[in-house]
């Protein structure tokens, strides 16, 4: 019997793509030698990736140092923007979390940057439903390893992972 629910964030609880694209456009405007325009489809294809893998996918023609510089700058700006403005929660997310939290312990594990889950909480006031969180931006580990950290740290048994990608599906089995 499942007693614990681990959630992915992007694509599962909210869709932040529009706000993220807005922020990235602003940041990239400071780099006149970079003519890349980040589209919603680009962002969608990067959801669930760690920051280094997303950088390689978005900016394959740039050296790794510049990729990471851009990723860090954009991610930092994202956290500020999304914390202040929020983004689109999926339908009935809060009602669902409220109902589930009465019976199950809820957690978020994401491949996002440090601060991203907190900006989600800040904007939407949903932290009250979650027991703990973890992300690759804090640990430097992939989602499967962060699932293990959450499970061990909270002495959990019988978790289920709710996500929207194949990577989410396999991350609990690692």
What are these language model-derived features?
Residues 12, 110-112:
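Conserved phosphate-coupling serine/threonine residues in phosphotransfer and NTP-handling enzymes
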Residues 11, 100, 171-172:
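Short hydrophobic faces within alpha-helices
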Residues 2-91:
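N-terminal helical cap/lid subdomain that shapes the substrate entry/recognition surface
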Residues 80-108, 118, 144:
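Short, acidic loop-to-helix structural element flanking the phosphoryl-transfer center
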Residues 16, 163-164:
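Acidic di-acidic motifs
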Residues 114-160, 166-173:
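Substrate-recognition "cap/lid" segment bordering the active-site pocket of phosphatases
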